[in-house]
Amino acid sequence: NYPAIKKWISHNREYYMTKDYIITKDKYGDWCVPPESLEMIHSQDPARKTDGALIATAYYLKVLQLMHRFASLQGLTADAKEWEDLEHKMKDAFNAHFLHIKEGTSLVPGHTLYPDSVFYGNNTVTANILPLAFGLVPKAHIKEVAKNAVTTIITTNKGHISTGVIGTQWLMRELSRRGHTDVAYLLATNDTYPSWGYMAAQGATTIWELWNGDTANPGMNSGNHVMLLGDLLPWCFNNLAGIRADRWKSGYKHIVFQPAFEIQELSNVDASYMSIYGKITSRWKKTPMHLEWDIELPANTTG
């Protein structure tokens, strides 16, 4: 509903945007991150929680990107320019406010210094994943920001999930997009807390509301709450099976196939998706010496 979203943009700009183009309104933040104690519902550790203004501003920028595209498709030239201009101003403000570049050090006089660490906010996985996923990171810093997200996952969190509802929506596909499908696969197959596999190992047949749903205070602890599934299933179809829609063609009219053959621990995938044109299938298996891949496309589509 383009007119309604337009009103939403105006409302938030009027009431919740600072003169420096930062959105301050946020209620839940990265809801339900794994807490520091198994009995807790919500973490109180500042190191685990992502700045609500970072989340709100990043999502406002994402909406502007979508609205620019929607306006362009409808031929609304003036609107498209308005969204694009505001996006550019907010993107610069976002990086000025949230991007941190810690300079390197050297004892050699005149030595060229490269950034020692580049990250957003307080360097949570969510704080780094959102700018990456929304195209907000300056090109020169993309690899460093992605590296910090991976380092936090592997080193700080020992290969475990640390994101809540917001970060988990983009986590898996963005890791793969940045060349870290192996890290995404580690998260997908981990069966110790906190992880999806841990839920299954404890007998869960649906997704819990909390990563620690088996131990947390029952005051807010649904056993059937799909929100923490995040983008795990889209990642399975888009990246493991490699079934993706061409974003510039409507409804899988053109299909992009690009499976994650590179995952050493994964030897076979069999997936199908019922699109509006019909069934799309990607089925592959491999050995160290052989790869076999079958795909099926519906009539009146290309791939």
Task: Give the residues covered by each predicted segment.
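Well-ordered alpha-helical scaffold segments within catalytic/enzyme domains
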Residues: 1, 59-77, 129-140, 169-179, ...
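Active-site acid/base region of carbohydrate-active enzymes
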Residues: 1-56, 71-130, 140, 190, ...
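Active-site-proximal structural scaffolding
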Residues: 5, 53, 63, 87, ...
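Generic hydrophobic alpha-helical scaffold/packing signal
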Residues: 9, 84, 91, 150, ...
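Charged/polar, low-hydrophobicity segments characteristic of intrinsically disordered regions
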Residues: 15-27, 96-107, 112, 160-176, ...
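Hydrophobic alpha-helical scaffolding
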Residues: 50-57, 84, 117-121, 158-161, ...
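Extracellular polysaccharide-recognition and catalytic grooves
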Residues: 101, 119-222
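Non-catalytic C-terminal accessory modules of carbohydrate-active enzymes
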Residues: 182-303
